[in-house]
Amino acid sequence: MIKRKLLGQHFLNSKSIAELIVNEAEISKDDVVFELGTGPGILIPLLCKKAKKVISVDADEQLTKKARSNFSQFDNLTLKSGDGFKKKDTFSIFVSNLPYSKSKDAIEWLAQKSFSHGVIMVQKEFAEKLIAKSKDRRAVSIIATYALDIKKISIVRKNNFSPPPKVDSVILKISKKTDLDKKLISLINDIFSYRRKTVKNILKQFNQQSTIEKRIDDLTGEEIVNLAKQILKK
């Protein structure tokens, strides 16, 4: 079994919080739900009772095998092992207690995927990054808020996990606004490596010209995305 600490993963052990996550996901019998991180499967019975189909993926093959044994009664459940970000499944709703080490990757992946909405649980510090303003923003903040509507649902205390993490978590509801392609996401990350420079000097790095003296921190999220689009057009 993959050591969970290597993945930064802590398993939810609270049924009431599991119910809150599933209720906030607003699942109908027409929905296909994609769960990243099967774990012990605390969400699976709740998801399967509401959805048309549930696809649950875990990086740990042993956990997937255990889930197949424990949840064989659900005909609408598909269990897979491997890297969930490489799966080609289509879905309408995304649900995940995101491993801390994979949270940024998950947001960038979701920004590229077409889906309706979802509920994710992330480390409190990471949640604050996603909704940060101005100088506290990171590239992932821009990517997240441009591609997604994000609403904070609840703080989840660390004693609701096994093993307990060092910090609390936050449940977020996300709704898809628009897709961002992989090249654009990569370029937004590159732009933030020059965040202390002016737009004029950033564009010089890409052999382009500008007279704009503003720094990245002075631009809106939309302006940063448009800057990346401008660079890609050349």
Residue ranges and their predicted role:
Residues 166, 196, 204-234:
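Conserved Class I S-adenosyl-L-methionine
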